Amino acid sequence: MIKCTRRIEFDAGHRIIGHQNKCQFLHGHRYVLEIAIAANKTDKLGMVIDFGLIKDVAKKWIDENFDHSLILHQDDKEMGQQIENCTGQKIYYMQNNPTAENIATHLKNEIFPKLFVGQNFFVSNLKLYETPNCFVEV
């Protein structure tokens, strides 16, 4: 198997409902996403995927949905609506707490498979850095 990885950076805020520490409060991160696309063999040009295609597809989705947004649990809609009404802030709701683990799993299992359809490659894994020292991999 051959993998090509593209790094995408974005800024977003979130909070973790029910967390007993400071992550229960609204705060933000400079996220770094590494998306690995894999195939069993290269195409006729000798590539798994053009790195530009990863950028065009994945980064476009990230920019439209996550970048400079507030990522919240769907149970946080009341707060999200108040923030959106007061500031115009873009809000993205998830079905579960927006932990790094859940965000990465959501992207890998629900979002990116719909974006990279009908190709001879697949999203093999994602790394999502919440800080320079802390990341999850799915």
UniProtKB/Swiss-Prot annotation:
- Name the domain of life this protein comes from: Bacteria
Q: In which pathway does it act?
A: Purine metabolism; 7-cyano-7-deazaguanine biosynthesis
EC number in record: 4.1.2.50
Group of enzyme by EC: lyase
Recorded catalytic reaction(s): these are: 7,8-dihydroneopterin 3'-triphosphate + H2O = 6-carboxy-5,6,7,8-tetrahydropterin + triphosphate + acetaldehyde + 2 H(+)
CC cofactor note: Binds 1 zinc ion per subunit.
User: What cofactors are annotated for this protein?
Assistant: Zn(2+)
Binding-site list for Zn(2+): H14, H27, H29
Q: Which InterPro entries match?
A: 6-PTP_synth/QueD, 6-PTP_synth/QueD_sf
Q: Name one Pfam family in it.
A: PTPS
The function of this protein is: Catalyzes the conversion of 7,8-dihydroneopterin triphosphate (H2NTP) to 6-carboxy-5,6,7,8-tetrahydropterin (CPH4) and acetaldehyde.
What family does the database annotate? Answer: Belongs to the PTPS family. QueD subfamily.
Q: What is this protein called?
A: 6-carboxy-5,6,7,8-tetrahydropterin synthase
| Annotated organism of origin | Rickettsia felis (strain ATCC VR-1525 / URRWXCal2) (Rickettsia azadi)
